Amino acid sequence: LPGKTYQRLVDNEIEGGLVEDLRCCIVAGSPVIVFRKRRPLERRFLNENVQVLLDEPRNCYTSDEIAVIERFAASIGLDWGGVDVLRDRSSGRIYIVDANKTDMGPPVALKLGAKLRATRRMAQAFAVAFASKKR
């Protein structure tokens, strides 16, 4: 779309020759958890993570960036799902590069304990946001 899209290679390389994608899980339009998905630079475009860390949105984004992610989710009607965010190494800017209406849940490479914590956090946020208050 003219004026709405563009193509750019985001330099999301981090220390150790890895790239890092930030998968932000959205519940009720807000980031709840972040999976830091890391893989070797030469496998940048493959889904072959060598390390996945569970993190909090406030540790990955500024409050202004969280507001941007929330506005993006609202603009596309994303109450529940996941967005992939890349941070450019030289500018520090974030780029939302993908949105999924069915979040994939914890990545395979995440350790079991972190998978369970992530699933509980998402379930709790989902229950608070969407479960009926009536019994």
Where are these regions (language model features)?
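Hydrophobic residue at the +6 position relative to the catalytic HRD Asp in the kinase catalytic loop
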Residues: 83-85
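C-terminal active-site "lid" helix and adjoining low-complexity regulatory extension at the edge
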Residues: 74-78, 87-135
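Phosphate-binding site of ATP-dependent enzymes
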Residues: 1-73
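PAS/PAS-like sensory domains
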Residues: 4, 78-81
